[in-house]
């Protein structure tokens, strides 16, 4: 019944098995990939003809994690998988980015790649397995795909690179680097880095590219036996048409790209496009003309040719800058004074308002992943409204691009966050892109760094980011610093680099051609370093160190540690005690299993009251210490004072004042706040307190004053 073909690849001490012919046989390509006990099914299907009027390449990649893969049932009312999680969206993009440039130019048939995680051993991350499986499925499908690609993850532990580290090894790694590429070149890089040098990161990319060759060769060997007949697709030759269009509007295009302002430049380009359409496009007046979609496609190619050639020949870019010049920068902080922290970061025509909000443990995001449930205390949300580019468009829930850009900025900033023990806040950053002309994700990194410092977050060091571009032709190449939107669109690379004065924290690279060499990557990283340092210097003009304290409108949090055997007493039966503490003091109390207690409130008095209460449960009152107390009952022989959480003690009438007190009720009233010193305990264990040895204004211990030696008295 089945014609099963299987390829086993020994890969870095692990075994990757690619199998086809048993499952999903009606798909154009289907591969079941297994590493360890992680299993992913990848399928590839493509339409056999393009839709009429199709003017772009409609590739869709869906990475889906089934909860049964980890032996779990989905939470929620419906008990089935719903909208994609953040990880599913990010991995879908991770697979899409290296395969998209490898389809034959001009191919506009719809392609859908679906990667389904069927089993997860909680050791081998399915994202790399899915990437390799998707590559294999496309290669054997017969689609005009110039692959295969390979992909792998690289860690860095004890100054050594680790291929495809396990989830446990990744926790100890200073680098989480994902690389995809062909046999000849790197296509995609995604990473989170703990302030490592450019040389170490570049070494990791080279290590990854060498390591993935085993997978690429294995896929080729599988395809030799399992691949379908190649789909007959011949890209249309448009060279003659391009020459005619260039003759008609080439000068107009060249003139348009000498205009520095984005809006004016786009208006001139639109006029040139209209002229080309009027001259060549098929219409009622010109029935023998060219199909408008085909004409627009040729027009875009001509645009790219003119811009790229100009940059390579002159070294001058669209807006008049040289290849390594960064646009003018202005950073401002505290622009929204009632928020916890805010910044406005403007670089040329790209601008972001970034707002930092500090919260408590209750504000952490609960994440239910295949690997288990956990809470995330650092959140970054990126919003890209259509008005930021002068357009109308869809508003609503974030798209894949917004989720991806937000995660890139999150990765760049996370290595510089303070330890949870030092700063026990939940941090939420929101980046509102208000203008965009290239590199809005890196503007988010810079603005977020400033906003957190404005909020009093003790960052280890500020972080800056820059987007690099590339123009690559047979006769040379140019690496561009701080690219514009047009340069991103017309260029060959989008290379985003973020880091501090000490090293890199994040790297993301997408190649639109068949890969780049190590030499180009090395130059891009070196040029990016200079750009990052310049941007960091401009940011430091706005703020170069975090504020010493959080703002007035932020919650205050203090942390104490209690013995784990006292946790039950603080919580109480059914949570009775902790609810009483919260209701009485007005503070929030959060206790974890290790005995760490976080107490938060809008003001310090509430926090102190809650902490004192908790200490009264978990600690014994200290003889000789002075406490704030409240009179709870006045009797003939003295007053009972609540002084240490729920603990009460007696201030005998003789200990109320240094002057004679006939009736305690003459000087004390119930509810009165007093300062008392714990004298000790009587034979029956009753607590003895004194007011008269404490200055009721300052809280000073008067008995210590009385005990001054004669020599000290003389000196005084």
From Swiss-Prot:
PROSITE patterns recorded: KH_TYPE_1 (PS50084), S1 (PS50126)
Source species, domain of life: Bacteria
Top enzyme class: transferase
GO cellular component: cytosol
Residue segments, region Disordered: 695-716
Location in or out of the cell: Cytoplasm
Primary residence: cytoplasm
Cofactor: Mg(2+)
One MF term in the entry's GO annotations: RNA binding
Domain KH: residue ranges: 555-614
Catalytic reactions of this protein: RNA(n+1) + phosphate = RNA(n) + a ribonucleoside 5'-diphosphate
Keyword terms of this UniProt record: Cytoplasm, Magnesium, Metal-binding, Nucleotidyltransferase, RNA-binding, Transferase
Keyword RNA-binding among record annotations: yes
Gene3D superfamilies, sorted: GHMP Kinase, N-terminal domain, K Homology domain, type 1, Nucleic acid-binding proteins
Pfam families referenced in this protein's UniProt entry, alphabetically: KH_1, PNPase, RNase_PH, RNase_PH_C, S1
Biological processes, Gene Ontology terms: mRNA catabolic process; RNA processing
Xref: NCBIfam families: polynuc_phos, PRK11824.1
Entry similarity comment: Belongs to the polyribonucleotide nucleotidyltransferase family.
Function recorded in the entry: Involved in mRNA degradation. Catalyzes the phosphorolysis of single-stranded polyribonucleotides processively in the 3'- to 5'-direction.
Annotated HAMAP family: PNPase (MF_01595)
Protein's name according to its UniProt entry: Polyribonucleotide nucleotidyltransferase
Organism: Caulobacter sp. (strain K31)
Gene behind this protein: pnp
């Amino acid at each position: 019944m089945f014609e099963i073909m299987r390829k086993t690849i020994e890969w870095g001490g692990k075994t990757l098995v690619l199998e086809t012919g048993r499952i999903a046989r009606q798909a154009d390509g289907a591969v079941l990939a297994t590493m360890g006990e992680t299993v992913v099914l990848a399928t590839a299907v493509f339409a056999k003809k393009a839709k009429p009027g199709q003017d772009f390449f409609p590739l869709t990649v869906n990475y889906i994690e089934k909860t049964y893969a980890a032996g779990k049932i989905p939470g929620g009312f419906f008990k089935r998988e719903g909208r994609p999680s953040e990880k599913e969206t990010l991995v879908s993009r991770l697979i899409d980015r290296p395969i998209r440039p490898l389809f034959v130019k001009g191919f506009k048939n719809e392609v859908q790649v679906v990667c389904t995680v069927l089993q997860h051993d909680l050791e081998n991350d399915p994202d790399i397995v899915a990437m390799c499986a998707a590559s294999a499925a496309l290669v054997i499908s017969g689609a005009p795909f110039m692959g295969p690609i390979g992909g792998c993850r690289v860690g860095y532990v004890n100054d050594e690179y680790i291929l495809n580290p396990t989830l446990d090894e990744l926790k100890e790694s200073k680098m989480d680097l994902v690389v995809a590429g062909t046999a000849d070149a790197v296509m995609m890089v995604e990473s989170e880095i703990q302030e490592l040098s450019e040389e170490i990161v570049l070494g990791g990319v080279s290590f990854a590219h060498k390591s993935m060759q085993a997978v690429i060769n294995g896929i080729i060997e599988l395809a030799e036996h399992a691949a379908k007949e190649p789909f007959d697709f011949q890209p249309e030759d448009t060279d003659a048409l391009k020459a005619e269009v260039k003759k008609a509007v080439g000068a107009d295009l060249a003139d348009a790209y000498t205009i520095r302002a984005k809006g004016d430049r786009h208006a001139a380009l639109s006029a040139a496009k209209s002229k080309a359409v009027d001259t060549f496009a098929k219409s009622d007046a010109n029935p023998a003309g060219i199909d408008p979609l085909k004409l627009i496609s040729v027009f875009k190619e001509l645009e790219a040719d003119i811009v790229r050639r100009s940059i390579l020949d002159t070294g001058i870019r669209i807006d008049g800058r040289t290849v390594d010049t960064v646009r003018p920068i202005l950073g401002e902080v505290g622009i929204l004074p009632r928020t916890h922290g805010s910044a406005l970061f403007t670089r040329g025509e790209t601008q972001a308002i970034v707002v930092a909000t500090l919260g408590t443990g209750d504000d952490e995001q609960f994440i239910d992943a295949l690997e288990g449930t956990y809470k995330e205390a650092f959140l970054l949300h990126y919003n890209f409204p259509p008005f930021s580019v002068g357009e109308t468009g869809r508003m609503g829930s974030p798209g894949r691009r917004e989720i991806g850009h937000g995660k890139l900025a999150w990765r760049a900033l996370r290595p510089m966050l303070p330890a949870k023990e030092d700063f026990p806040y939940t941090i939420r950053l929101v980046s509102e892109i208000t203008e965009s002309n290239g590199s809005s994700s890196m503007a988010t990194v810079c603005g977020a760094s400033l906003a957190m410092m404005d909020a009093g977050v003790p960052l280890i060091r500020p972080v800056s980011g820059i987007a690099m571009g590339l123009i690559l032709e047979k006769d040379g190449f140019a690496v561009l610093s701080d690219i514009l939107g047009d340069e991103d669109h017309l260029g060959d690379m989008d290379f985003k680099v973020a880091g501090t004065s000490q090293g890199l924290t994040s790297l993301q690279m997408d190649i639109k051609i068949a890969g780049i060499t190590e030499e180009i990557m090395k130059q891009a990283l070196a040029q990016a370093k200079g750009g990052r340092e310049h941007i960091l210097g401009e940011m430091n003009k706005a703020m170069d160190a975090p504020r010493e304290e959080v703002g007035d409108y932020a919650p205050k949090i203090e942390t104490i540690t209690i013995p784990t055997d006292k946790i039950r007493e603080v919580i109480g039966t059914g949570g009775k005690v902790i609810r009483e503490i919260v209701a009485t003091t007005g503070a929030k109390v959060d206790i974890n299993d290790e005995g760490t207690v976080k107490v938060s409130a809008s003001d310090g008095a509430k926090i102190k009251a809650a902490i004192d209460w908790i200490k009264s449960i978990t600690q014994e009152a200290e003889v000789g210490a002075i406490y704030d107390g409240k009179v709870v009952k006045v009797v003939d022989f003295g007053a009972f004072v609540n002084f240490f959480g729920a603990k009460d003690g007696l201030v005998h009438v003789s200990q109320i004042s240094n002057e004679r007190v006939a009736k305690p009720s003459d000087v004390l009233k119930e509810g009165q706040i007093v300062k008392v010193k714990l004298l000790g305990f009587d034979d029956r264990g009753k607590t003895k307190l004194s007011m008269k040895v404490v200055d009721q204004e300052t809280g000073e211990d008067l008995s210590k004053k009385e005990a001054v030696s004669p020599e000290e008295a003389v000196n005084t």
